Amino acid sequence: MVLDGADWKRAIARHSGGVDEVWVRRVLETYRKLGFTYLRDGGDRWSVGAKARSLAGEYGITYRTPLSPLCAQGHYGGFIGEKYENLSQYAAMVSQKRAEDADFIKIMISGLMDFDRFGVLTEDGLPPETIRELIHIAHEEGFAVMAHANGARTVEAAAQAGVDSVEHGAYLDTDALRAMRENGTVWVPTLSTIGNLRGTGRFDETAVAAILESAMENVAAFAAMGGLIAPGTDAGAWAVPHGSLSEYALLEQVLGENAENILSRGAAEIQRKF
């Protein structure tokens, strides 16, 4: 909710003096007009998502938020989330999220795609044993877990640990896809964060095309396995404004005539888990 798809620094500054309720209401109204009745937020440390949750009922929307994502000190996510230095501190933060009435826990366990270089992430994922502990601790507190995760081994480790959903999931292989399917992980591939970059001139067009092709091939393979796929735009990411429906077009392109059934099944599982 905090980001706007254009300028992340400006978007964050919008709430520097407190949550801009006018902005939040404008975004909620956008989704209401589009017919959305359920939104799952990625969280932020300025309480923008929390404010959105408190207002969403006025717009006929069920709104779920982790309040803020949790990220390891020195790794990706600190610009928007809360940082922990060790597992003990993370566990205390998870307990605090329970006291603050978070709906679920979001963990940041990998870097981003480098959109100028196919196959490259901005940093490696966290160690598998750390990923397992992060998910276990949150589950023990009764939370579902959303994971920002890219890279085959990172996603495989998260799925094997029982993560409830994976957001993004770039550069997966058969083992990672199979792990998600076998463990009931819902994959939210956020294709629009890649596809919407085409033609903008911001990144290498050849690399963007290759990244998108790879992601779409994996979505098709996962669907063929019977895996759970849900639509989610990562709204607020660069070139993905709130209300953008390009994610649905991209998923329909991959999934064909079965798209509605596949996505409805995945979305229902998201709502059940979260």
Where are these regions (language model features)?
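His/Asp/Glu-enriched, well-ordered alpha-helical/loop segment
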Residues: 140, 203, 212-274
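Glycine-rich, aromatic-flanked loop segments that form ligand/cofactor-binding clefts
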Residues: 44-72, 188
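N-terminal small/glycine-rich loop or linker at the start of catalytic domains
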Residues: 1-10, 61-80, 131-132
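Non-cysteine beta-strand/loop elements that form the S-adenosyl-L-methionine
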Residues: 1, 64-69, 102-110, 185-193
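Active-site environment of divalent metal-dependent phosphoester hydrolases
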Residues: 2-4, 45-49, 71-72, 111-115, ...
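Active-site mouth loops of central-metabolism enzymes
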Residues: 8-23, 75-92, 144-146
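Histidine/acidic residue-rich metal-binding segments in metalloenzymes
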Residues: 88-109, 113-187, 208-229
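Metal-associated gating/positioning segment near the N- to mid-region
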Residues: 1-54
